[in-house]
């Protein structure tokens, strides 16, 4: 006797994008194509998995089941055999996975080492650049110091020149110069007077060496001294 | 009134369907509600039934997981479950069936011995889960677990299939089961 079985169905709509939460507001419009992408990728993975399951069922159904009616114990023995085979296949798979993982590990370790080397070299480069910068700074400082010194020398020179010029323009010098000029004029006049005296006296001054010397001396132009 | 077959229909896109079979309507409804509240990226469909076979008139999607709920307090539930199991296609027992025993917390009310359900699960080579569906927190945790199980059975998790999961779960079972 079969009882009338009741059936009720309850459903729940999916959260697109996979995050359980309130529905997205208008501000998240930019995120929707990405959600669609993730949804599509998820559907693709699901369909792949389901296809795999169907394929394996088809393959399993192609196997021939034994026609004879075997005893229960034999059936159980066969079941155990098959289970053992499955276990062996699984362990072989696990070993392969471990081997691959170890290779992967090696690669990762190498990558890590290389990264460390890169970081060290970068650090060294940084230090050298800093040193270069220091040397350049020092050179700049030295240049500036030498510039200052030269400037000082120039100002000193200029000052000296100015002093000299100012000195020349001072009144004392002028007075002395005036005096000198008057003296020179007086002496020149005296020279001319003596010259004319000696020449006027009509003496032969070439014969007497002392007289000759005096006359020649009188010829000296005092302004040239 | 034909037997349920696991792969006779094409799966719905992003949909996973679970069938809860048991005599305790209130418990099933509560469990269904907890499952629908759980976090899941796929669409969930929960069908409830008192016993198999299901009426053919209803157009239902492909069922990915069947959970038989046995209440340890009542012998009727165990009987009904055992009767329903005959109407199931053998292909279902490759990972798409699970047994859920409830009511083990209150030992004084238990009329079915724990070992009975254990033997039942062992005979059908299916996983057995224990949960007190009356307690809110346990129910929520079990609902989460069932949702994950359902996702794998529906093929939504790449790399793990129902059969794979079955052998994985069996590996962690108590080895003393073999003595039964």
Swiss-Prot record, chain B:
Cytoplasm in keyword set: yes
GO cellular component, one term: kinetochore
Protein name (Swiss-Prot/TrEMBL): Centromere protein M
Pfam families (alphabetical): CENP-M (PF11111)
Annotated organism of origin: Bos taurus (Bovine)
Protein origin, superkingdom: Eukaryota
Keyword Cytoplasm: yes
Localization: Nucleus; Cytoplasm; Chromosome, Centromere, Kinetochore
Lineage of origin: Eukaryota, Metazoa, Chordata, Craniata, Vertebrata
PANTHER family hit by this protein: CENTROMERE PROTEIN M (PTHR34436:SF1)
Subunit structure: Component of the CENPA-NAC complex, at least composed of CENPA, CENPC, CENPH, CENPM, CENPN, CENPT and CENPU. The CENPA-NAC complex interacts with the CENPA-CAD complex, composed of CENPI, CENPK, CENPL, CENPO, CENPP, CENPQ, CENPR and CENPS.
Keywords: Centromere, Chromosome, Cytoplasm, Kinetochore, Nucleus
InterPro entries named among the record's database cross-references: Centromere_Cenp-M (IPR020987), P-loop_NTPase (IPR027417)
Function: Component of the CENPA-NAC (nucleosome-associated) complex, a complex that plays a central role in assembly of kinetochore proteins, mitotic progression and chromosome segregation. The CENPA-NAC complex recruits the CENPA-CAD (nucleosome distal) complex and may be involved in incorporation of newly synthesized CENPA into centromeres.
